[in-house]
Amino acid sequence: MCKSRLPTVLSLTLIYISISIGFSVYFYVLMEAAYDQFSSMFESYTQTAVHLQSNSRTLKSDLSDYMQLLNYSRKFDESGEESVLRRHNITTPRVFYIDLNYTTALGAENRNLNMINFYAIPYRYVDLLDPFGNSIPVTGRTPATEYIDCSRDKKEKCIDSIPPFDGVLDCLSLDIHMQPWSRNNKSFNRPIIIWLGEVAGELWRLVAGGLIVIRANYRRGCYGFLCHHDQSLPYRNQGVNDVLHAIDWTIENARHFAGDISKITLAGHGASASLVEYIRLNHGHHLPLDKYIVMSANNFGSRDLYCSSNSNVMVTTARLLGMPPSPATESGKERSVYESVRYLSFVEPKLVMSKLYGLKAAFHPCPLSVNNRRASTFGIGFKTKNHTSSNCIRTANEQPVLFTNTLNEYHNFVYGSTVFTHARSETILRTIGDMLSRHFIESRLAYANSSTEKLIQQVNGQYNVVDGEFVDYDAFIRLLTDFAFIMPTVKMNEFTTECGGNSYHYVFDFGNSTHGDDLKMLTSSANDTSLTHFQRQLADGLGFILSKFVRRGYPVKKQDGWCPSTGLVAQIMEMNTKDENVVVKKSTEGVLIPLLNQSYVLHFHRVSVAKQKCYNRLGNVPFWNDLLKFHQSARRGWRDGDTGCARSKYLSEIV
C-alpha cells in the first residue's frame, strides 16, 4: 500500500515544485520587464534632464560630464504609459534629476519662469524620539538607482511657534531652484544663495539673476532655540546647528549642480534674518560664507544679546501638560529642564507650541558667550577718538553684508520702538553722521525738530550748535538714493570700503511700506495682476540688486549701465511729489532717510519757495543749487517722455 503511494507523492511533489519554479520565473520576468519598461519610459519620455554623469543608473565619483542637458525626441503626451509616470508623482513632460552624494533627486521645470525646482531634499533627519536634540545624518541609499521625488512643492516647513502652529518635526529639508543651463565646463559655476526659512512665493527673480537659490528649513521655537545655562545638556541652539548642517550639505553637494562654493551667501528675512546676523557674528570666522543678506531683522541678532534662560518656562509647560513634579536634586532647575524636555519630546508639538505661546515665551539664539556691552564693530570700522569722515582707522575686512529695512521699520528703529529694532542699528546711525559730515561743516550741522529729538541724542553728539542756527528736518526734507527706495549710495559704499568694512544698508520705501512688503514684492509672480507696471519694475529691481550683491559683493553702480532705473525713478518721483503724499509723509515721524549721497537721483518732495530759503543755511550752497537744477531739469525731461541715460551726467558732475 505504502509502496504504491510513493510514486504518487513524488509526482505531486515534482509537479508542485515545477509550478512554484514556473511562477517564480514568471514573476521575475514580469518584474524585470516592468523595471525595464519604467527605465525606458523614464529616459524616453524625459524631454530634458539635468544629469551629472553619462550613466543614469550608477553614481560615479568622476564627474566628467558636467551638467549635461539631455534631449529626447519622443513627446510625453504620445505615450500610453503616462499613467505610470503619474503613479510615481511625475506629472510634467520635462523631468530633471541630479545625483547627490546619497541619492538621486527628481525635480520639475517651471516653463513660465525658465527654472528647475527640487523640493524637500532632506539634508538631516530629526530624531522623533528626541526632537529637541541633535539631528541625524542622512545616510547613503542603495542601490544607486533609487531616487526621491522632489518634483512637487509639498510646502514642507518646520512647526511654527505662532498660530496656527503649522508644520512638522522632521522638517530638515531644502529646496533648490536654478536655471536649466547646459555646460560641460567645470569652471562654469554659479553663485549660491542659501535662504533661511519659508517664503510665500518664488525667489525666481534671484534665479533669473544667475544664482542658484537654496531655501533651507530649520527648527524654530523651543525645538530650535532652547536656551539654558547648563552646557552639558544637548538642548541648545539646535536651529543654529541645523543651519550649519545645511551649509555643510551645500558645500558637499554643490559640485553636483554647478554651484560655486567660493561664492555662498547666507540670507533671510525677519526672524530668519536675525539668525543670519547671529551666525555672522558668532560663526562667521570659521564658515566658508562669502556674503550675508539681513532683511528686516530685529535686535535679537546683535552681539550684545543677553542669554536669558528658558528653563522655567519649559518646566512650567511640561507640568501644565501633565508631567508630575520631579524630586529635588542637586542640579535643581537644570535637572528639571532635562526631565521637562524629555517629557515634552513625546507630547504633540502643536500642544507644546500652543502652551508656550499662551505663556508668551520667546525663543531666540543664545550666544556662545554673553557680552554685556555693545559690540564695537559697526560695519564701517571701529569708532575711535581719531575717527572722522575723512580719516578712519582701517580694520580687518569682513565679508560684505547687506542690511535692508522697509520705511516703517526704519521709523520704528529711529524712535526706539521696543517692537522692532534693527539688528545693526549702530551701523545706520554711524553712517548718518559720517555721510552728513562729508557734505556739511561739522560745527554748523545741528538738528532741531520735535520729531527728531531722539535722533539728535543718538547721532549728533559730535556736532555743536553755532550762532543759534538749526536745520529743520522738514525743511531738509528727505533724500532718497539711486533707484530711489532700495539703492544705497555709491559714496556710502566707497566710504565703508575705505574704512575697512563692507556694510551696506537699503531702505525700501514704497507706499509707507511695512514689515514684509519688500519680500512680498520680491517673490511676487511675474504675471501678478494685483501689481501695477511700476510695482513689477520695482520688484524686478529688487531682484536685480540682490543678485548683483551676491555675485560681486557690492551694489549696483552707474558703471553697470543701470540706466533703466532713471525712468523708474521718474515714476517714483512723480508719484511721491504729489501734494497728498507730502502731507502723509509729514505726518509720519522720522520722515528723513538720510542715506546720502551719490546716485543717479537725490530726491526732494515738492519744495515751496519758503522752504527753499532753508537750503541756503546748509553749508554747501552750490551743491544744493546744482541738485535743485538737476531736479527741475529731470522732471521736465520725464514729462516729455525722455528716458535717455544722458541726464545721469548731472549727478556725476554734482558729486
UniProtKB/Swiss-Prot annotation:
GO terms for molecular function: carboxylesterase activity. The active site is at residue 515. Glycans are attached at residues 71, 89, 101, 185, 386, 449, 512, 527, 597. Its EC number is 3.1.1.1. It is found in: Membrane. InterPro entries: AB_hydrolase_fold, CarbesteraseB, Type-B_Carboxylest/Lipase. The keyword Electron transport does not apply. Its main location: membrane. The keyword Zinc does not apply. The chain crosses the membrane at residues 9-29. This is Putative esterase. It comes from Heliothis virescens ascovirus 3e (HvAV-3e). The lineage of its organism: Viruses, Varidnaviria, Bamfordvirae, Nucleocytoviricota, Megaviricetes.
